[in-house]
Amino acid sequence: MSTYRKTYKNQSKRFNNGNNSNSTSTELTNLVEMFPDWEADELQGLLSENDNSLEIVIDLIVNNKVSKWEPIKKEKHKKKEHKDDTTDSVTGNANGASNSGSSNSTTASGDRRLNNKAKASTSSRPPKRQQHPNAAHKKNEKTERSKASTVSTTTTSATSSVTKESVPPSNSWAAALSNDKPKKQETKSEASESIPSSNDGGDAETVPEVEQAETLEESHQEPENVEEPIESVSEQSQPENTKPVLKSAAIPEPKQGSWASAIAPKTKPKPKTVSKPVPQPEESKPEEHIPVQEEAQPVESILEDKPAVEAVQPVQPPVEDEPVEAPAASSVAAVADASFSEPTASSIIDQQPQVVLPTTQQQVDSVGISFGSLSVDAGEPKEAAEVIQDETISEQVQPEQQQQSQQQPLQEQQRYGLYNQQPTQQRYQQNNYQQQGQYSKQQQQQQQQQTSQPTQQQQQYDYYGQYQQQQYPQQTAQPGAQFGGYPGFDYNAYNQQAFAAAAAASPAASHVATIGGGVGGYNQYAQQANSADSTQSPIVNQSTLQQQQAAVLAAQQQQQQLPTPFGYPAYYNYYYNNPYFNAGGLGSTGFSAPQQGTQQGTQQQQSQQSGQQQQQVSSANQQGSVSSNSFGAQQQYYNPNQFNSRYPGYSYPPQQQNQQSSQHTSGQSQQGAQTTSDGASDGQQTSQQGQSSQQPQQQQQQHAQPVPQQHMMPQYGAYQQYPQYGYQDSNQYRGGWY
């Protein structure tokens, strides 16, 4: 907002219209050509009223839906004059003289003062012209332009002063529009001209220098804005204008570089000049840095010469910001240059102690950092005092910087620390990485840790893989059958992809262990992992149980289990047992058939007996239970008793011994439920009673631990180790849910 304040002193209308005219310059010019009898102002008003829609305005005019503003003919003449001025200013001709002859002489004298001081400052600053070849080229162009514009600017500045004096909208507004039409920069220049003209009374001298500083700023910023070659070019060309014609016109052109800069930067310009050398080093332009150093010194001398400019100078903290920004913005380019830019910055600091990065950085905390011209106005008074301090500090710091110049690269990193320290380190690193197009620390670390990360990744994936192997054995069903029951989806490709990706990712992902690296391995492990991993963490010995149940499960699980995609808990299974309704062939596979259940129950009972003997009964039972999704599903939903929670995903997994007993109970109860088709499997005892005849031993052993069903010790917090975790069979509902 602060950037706009001065704009509205004299230029509120001009810039408001100027902005519109800038946006609608093409439409407006077309309309002016199409309807020469219409006033540009009227057309502009129509455009602004109709969202700058050329077609709508033409339609309105052609259909006489809109009529010219007839009554005000005098204003039309004035507007015509404005048009002339705009066209003249657009062409860059010095037409302002017609509007103000005496004002030209008066403003010309003011402009001459500006030119003298500006030239003095520019003479001290000429290396800036050398800073950019583009600047030199466009400087030549704009020097010519500035020559024309100097006449026009003397006239326009005179006219702007006249507009201040008499008809502020007339020349400056039309000039602003005309400049806006051809070039926003010119509008800015005239606007800035009107600004200095407004300031001509007492601030005219200060303002021209400020403008010079702005031009310098922008020239400096241009290296900063190398990413923004347009602005930098305009700004560079503008510095030429400022240098050859330090009149307000020349200054406004650098303002043209950035509209906000044209408005507010006057306060900044010198600080940016100071900042300018800094950004240049960051862009690693040592040649420019040296002139910038020279320039920065004259800038400070000028600043010292004029406290008002010093008030402008306080923006030096933004200078820090800008170098910071420049590394950020130009980090890509600067990273390549970073090795150069920072040492150049340090050497420049030595050469240019006046650019006090450390002190300004230190002060940046105290001084409100303003990026761009936003906070310039608000910060001016404080910044003025602080700028004085900055100058003194910079003077003090100059020897310090010389001393610190060697240290400075580190200090810059440190003082920029929040901004640059890591970025600079990363820049050096990124110099390597940018070549590879890698910037993120993660990538760097990955490159650095590529050796270490594969293991880490494996560990990470293993971390989940344990869950997945243990908790999602559901996943290990036949690949074809994985979602077979789930309507409308063919998950085979996804399963294969998931398997391949997971297998590539980590051993956990290799779902020969869990889901199965391949369909063959997938089926195999569906047998084994479902049986073994379903209940057990890989910690428990699964080999015996897996082997025991592998044969049984091989025939059954391959057909029976529907795995969710790798690592994916079958949530829809929780809510919708889509694959588990007989649709998936699960029921057809015989989950519903108590025969398999009984067979599995007996087999599981056998394995459970051996497992109990091995303390692995948990794996045995769940292997059996998992092996038949019916069992796993029963354990999940079908037996709410298992952990006194019918929500398997949230019940705490029992410790393995408890798991063994509880899973025996649950698994057997489920088995018994299937075998006995007891809906009462909710009561494990009932299901166990069904099984009790089959497995009195296990029941006795299991009853020894009746509570473990409620095991509150989560081995894996929210995750159950059980294949139950994802499984629900149609049996689940047959079992008596419904």
From Swiss-Prot:
Keywords assigned by UniProt, alphabetized: Chromosome, Cytoplasm, DNA damage, DNA repair, DNA-binding, Nucleus, Telomere, Ubl conjugation, Ubl conjugation pathway
What organism, scientifically named, is this protein from?
A: Candida albicans (strain SC5314 / ATCC MYA-2876) (Yeast)
Q: Where is the composition biased (Polar residues)?
A: 631-645
Kindly list the places in or outside the cell where this protein is found, as annotated in its UniProt entry.
Cytoplasm; Nucleus; Chromosome, Telomere
The answer, when asked if Amino-acid biosynthesis is one of the entry's keywords, is: no
The identity of this protein, by name, is RNA polymerase II degradation factor 1
Biased composition annotated in UniProt, kind: Acidic residues: 202-216
Q: Note the subunit structure.
A: Homodimer; may form higher order oligomers. Interacts with the large RNA polymerase II subunit RPO21; the interaction is direct and serves to bridge RPO21 to the Elongin complex in a manner dependent on transcription stress. Interacts with RAD26.
Record PTM: Ubiquitinated. Proteolytically cleaved by the proteasome in response to transcription stress; the resulting N-terminal form constitutes the activated nuclear form and the C-terminal portion is degraded.
